[in-house]
């Protein structure tokens, strides 16, 4: 886990660092907020990772706090994404937008599953708050959106191949997600959720290139 955390932090920092030119004052302000939240999140995550390295386990509350912080980062990122479109006058095409939202949904599912796995024997707090959906409900939402993407007539041979590869990876963890109260397999879910997110990001790039 510690190695994966280090890699993820490096990737996150690189992506945030690539966001430089904003189209307006609103997006500039949101980017500054995002940068501040990221620095705080990064510090919390490093402390948690160091604790995991030295003790082999962590307390439940810091895990729950980090999951909530992750959700706040995602919400702020989505707000910045919308503001950039608004201020630039550019809108994202439908399938590009849907595939990007699907990537965020996969991340939410993975975060909730990891948090639940870490809270065995204790209370679990979803990253979406008290009124959020359960993991199996989120998994069902993921399947429905995948079906919608697959059925889109605008798909090309390339995007259909990408969708097929994503669906194959999804099958490895779908049962575990829908039966999350049974045997916990956090490493399996983390491994394949990362690959699914990578696949969805590649898919959104393919859609964006075709403006669909």
Q: What do these predicted ranges mean?
A:
Residues 3-61, 69-72, 139-182, 204:
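Heptad-repeat alpha-helical coiled-coil/4-helix-bundle sensor or tether segments in soluble regions
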Residues 59-163:
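Extended amphipathic alpha-helical interaction segments
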Residues 1-7, 26-29, 33, 58, ...:
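Extracytoplasmic/periplasmic, Sec-exported soluble proteins
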Residues 4-7, 41-46, 91-122, 168-178, ...:
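N-terminal extracytoplasmic segments of bacterial inner-membrane proteins
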Residues 64-76, 189, 196, 200, ...:
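Charged, amphipathic alpha-helical scaffolding segments
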Residues 21, 53-54, 82-86, 212:
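Short, charged/polar, low-complexity loop and linker segments
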Residues 131-139, 200-210:
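Short secondary-structure transition/capping segments
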């Amino acid at each position: 886990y510690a190695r994966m955390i280090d890699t993820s932090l490096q990737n996150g920092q690189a992506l945030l660092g690539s966001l430089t030119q904003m189209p307006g004052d609103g997006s500039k302000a949101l980017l500054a907020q995002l940068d501040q939240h990221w620095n705080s999140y990064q510090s919390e995550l490093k402390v948690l990772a160091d604790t995991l390295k030295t003790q082999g386990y962590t307390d439940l509350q810091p895990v729950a706090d980090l999951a909530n912080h992750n959700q706040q980062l995602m919400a702020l990122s989505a707000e910045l994404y919308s503001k950039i479109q608004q201020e630039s006058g550019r809108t994202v095409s439908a399938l590009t937008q849907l595939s990007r939202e699907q990537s965020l949904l996969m991340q939410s599912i993975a975060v909730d599953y990891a948090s639940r796995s870490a809270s065995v024997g204790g209370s679990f707090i979803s990253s979406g708050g008290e009124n959020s959906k359960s993991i199996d409900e989120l998994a069902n939402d993921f399947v429905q959106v995948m079906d919608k993407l697959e059925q889109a007539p605008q798909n090309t041979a390339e995007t259909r191949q990408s969708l097929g590869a994503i669906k194959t990876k999804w099958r490895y963890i779908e049962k575990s997600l829908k039966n999350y109260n049974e045997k916990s397999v956090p490493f399996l879910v983390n491994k394949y959720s990362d690959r699914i997110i990578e696949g969805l990001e590649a898919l959104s790039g393919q859609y964006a290139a075709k403006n669909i």
